[in-house]
Amino acid sequence: LIENQMKIRIDPKSNPTWFEQYIKKSNGFVSYGDDPIVSLKAVKNHVELEGTRNAHLRDGVAFARFLHWFDKNAPSEKLDEITVADQLKTFREEGALFKDLSFDTISGSGPNGAIVHYRVSSETNRKLKNGDLYLIDSGAQYLDGTTDITRTLAVGDPGDEARDRFTRVLKGHIALATQKFPKGTTGSQIDILARAPLWSIGMVLDQVTGHGVDSYLG
């Protein structure tokens, strides 16, 4: 219950308007500010960390099986975006503690792979062709953790331009992953390391470098 003139903080970025209206209607005082729980949730405890490591190990096994299957079957040009996404899900389902996908799989070949947050449907479903780049962005919910992995795969020979761009992205990834930095450094301060190889040839990377991943809670 809200007592008269009780001061209650709400985060306007996440709280439903109903709460603000209810507080005011009950003669409470609304104080706007960031939700203090958000920063606490961003730090995993030791149980969540251990679960995340184990979940990623199992997910990595499923993805390694998928990569082998993809390399063997994609050049036949008989696969389509839905079939490939379903096959990866099957490999994950065969592992332990799998609950569901963590989000709808982004499965895009050729031009579809360049569409941000593309969602394949029966109308847009495209067959994979030799020379295509195929993007798969997917993840799983395991009882002990959550995964999210994105990979760009070549069907046959992707050509010199694709190899060059892929190599530049890899250089940026290695530079960022191996950089030593002092405590307190923010992601935005070292983000340029990932982008520099593309910037050097006048290209802009329009995507974010990385993001956090939650833990499955049921």
Question: Where would I find each of the regions flagged by the language model?
Answer:
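Active-site neighborhoods and metal-handling regions in enzymes and metal-associated proteins
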Residues: 1-218
